[in-house]
Structures are given as structure tokens and as C-alpha cells.
Curated annotation (Swiss-Prot):
Its EC number is 4.2.1.32. It comes from Shigella sonnei (strain Ss046). Heterotetramer of two alpha and two beta subunits. It catalyses: (2R,3R)-tartrate = oxaloacetate + H2O. The active site is at H37. The gene is ttdB. Pfam families: Fumerase_C (PF05683). Belongs to the class-I fumarase family. This is L(+)-tartrate dehydratase subunit beta. Signal peptide: none annotated. Keywords: Lyase. GO terms for molecular function: L(+)-tartrate dehydratase activity.
Length: 201
């Protein structure tokens, strides 16, 4: 059965979700990447949209005007780790509950997700056009002076996903755990290979 989160998301909605779970989002998803994070955390500029209980997407979309409305053409995730130095404070200050992006995030985001009850989730890379089909409407846009990729596009989405949980509210970090596991598996294999191919060195 599909696990669907609907905004506004509450802390109790997230307590039973664990890393490696697959979930979907219905409701409000706001594109929000480097400059937005810097403006809030470094420049202390308030975000012109209430993110409390909502979801953000580390993404720089392609949109087009259709009459008096905006239409999503393509919206793929950008590398979440670029926002690592800001994300803990960002979660604390905004009350955002779902951070969608590409790849994992680090210990600061882990701490933020655990302390302030949020999730980091991964949207599959290479599926930007598919993601755009899950955007029902662009309801608002803010900070357009930043250009299309960095503007805040407030989207209404339906069953947006699949989203793989990479950090949960209990401090678990799927990507960090996998790196350790892969290293443990890799080292003895590399040693064995080196015994047979030492002449290449």
C-alpha cells in the first residue's frame, strides 16, 4: 500500500517512517535551492512563503508561460549536499517537514531532521519530465529576480514520487550507513584482487 504524505505535514505523520521506505507527497512542494538557503541563513531575509508543514525541493525547474499561468516543463533534483551547511538551521527556522533532493545529506541535516522532526528524501535522478507531470499547478512564484532555476516555485503536486527516505526523524542516515557497509565489503575484495594483479602496480 502506498504511503502518501499530505501537507500540512505534522511530526506525528513522520514518526513511523524509516530510512529506505518509499513515500509519495500530495499538497505543496516549493522549489528551493542554494540562493534561497543563503538568503535566509546568511542574509537573514525572510522567505516570502510559509513553509511550515510543507515540502521543499532542491531543484532548478524549467517552466513556461501558458496564458496567465505558469506550466512546469521539467523539474529534476539537484545535489542536496550543496545545502548541507544550511539545512539544519533552515529546517529549524521554517518548520519545513520534507526536504526532497538528489543524493544524501550529512550530519548537520541528520541533527536537524531528528531534533525538529523532518525527513530528507531522494527523488530519482533522470526523471525530470516525469516529475513535471506530477505537478498539477504552479500556484505562486517568488524571488523571480533570481532567475528561473533559483526562484521559489510553489507547486501543487499529487502523489509526487517515488521518494526514498534517506534521513528519518530518528537520526538514521541511509546513504551514510550504505557507505560504511560498502567500504566493509570493498576492502577484503580489493585485498584479494591485489594479490592477483600486484604486477600492475
Amino acid at each position: 500500500m502506498k504511503k502518501i504524505l499530505t501537507t500540512p505535514i505534522k511530526a506525528e505523520d513522520l514518526q513511523d517512517i524509516r530510512v529506505d521506505d518509499v513515500i509519495y507527497l500530495t499538497g505543496t512542494l516549493v522549489t528551493c535551492r542554494d540562493v534561497c538557503h543563503r538568503r535566509l541563513i546568511e542574509l537573514k531575509r525572510p522567505i516570502p512563503y510559509d513553509l511550515n508543514g510543507k515540502a521543499i525541493f532542491h531543484a532548478g525547474p524549467i517552466v513556461r508561460k501558458n496564458g496567465d499561468k505558469w506550466e512546469m516543463v521539467s523539474v529534476g533534483p539537484t545535489t542536496s549536499m550543496r545545502m548541507e551547511s544550511f539545512e539544519r538551521e533552515f529546517i529549524e527556522q521554517t518548520g519545513v517537514k520534507l526536504v526532497v533532493g538528489k543524493g544524501g545529506m550529512g550530519p548537520l541535516t541528520e541533527e536537524g531532521c531528528q531534533k525538529f522532526k523532518a525527513l530528507h528524501v531522494i527523488f530519482p535522478a533522470g526523471c525530470a519530465v516525469l516529475a513535471a507531470t506530477q505537478v498539477e499547478e504552479i500556484e505562486e512564484v517568488h524571488w523571480t529576480e533570481l532567475g528561473m532555476p533559483e526562484s521559489l516555485w510553489v507547486c501543487r503536486v499529487k502523489e509526487f514520487g517515488p521518494l526514498i527516505v534517506s534521513i528519518d526523524t530518528h537520526g538514521n542516515n541511509l546513504i551514510a550507513e550504505n557507505k560504511k557497509l560498502f567500504a566493509e565489503r570493498r576492502d577484503p575484495i580489493v585485498e584479494e584482487i591485489c594479490e592477483h594483479v600486484h604486477y600492475i602496480k
